[in-house]
C-alpha cells in the first residue's frame, strides 16, 4: 500500500461549492468509510524561505490537502469520485505519491 497526497488548488470556478462545509463533511465521511483516509487540512497563508534572501508570501493557489493510502496512482484517483468538492466544482486536484525514503 502506498501513501498519496491530494493538493486542492484554489482555482475552481464554483468556489462556493469547492469550500462548502457540508460537501466536505460528506466527502470526508466517505473517505473515512473506505479505511484509506489518513488525514488532511485546509492550508492557510505562509511564507517562502530561502537562505540569504528575505522571506516572501506564498502564492494563494493551494486551499488544502488530503492524505490517503492506495495500491496505485489509479486507485488513488478513484478516491476523488464521487464527491471531492474542488474536483466536482471544476478545480484542480494535484495527486502526488509520498514515497518512503
Model-identified regions with their sequence ranges:
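Conserved, structured core segments of small domains
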Residues: 1-101
Amino acid at each position: 500500500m502506498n501513501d498519496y497526497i491530494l493538493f486542492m488548488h484554489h482555482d475552481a470556478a464554483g468556489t462556493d461549492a469547492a469550500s462548502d462545509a457540508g460537501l466536505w463533511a460528506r466527502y470526508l465521511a466517505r473517505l473515512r468509510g473506505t479505511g484509506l483516509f489518513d488525514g488532511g487540512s485546509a492550508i492557510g497563508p505562509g511564507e517562502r524561505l530561502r537562505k540569504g534572501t528575505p522571506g516572501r508570501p506564498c502564492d494563494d493557489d493551494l486551499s488544502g490537502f488530503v492524505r490517503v493510502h492506495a495500491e496505485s496512482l489509479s486507485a488513488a484517483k478513484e478516491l476523488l469520485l464521487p464527491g471531492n468538492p474542488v474536483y466536482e466544482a471544476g478545480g484542480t486536484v494535484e495527486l502526488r505519491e509520498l514515497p518512503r525514503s
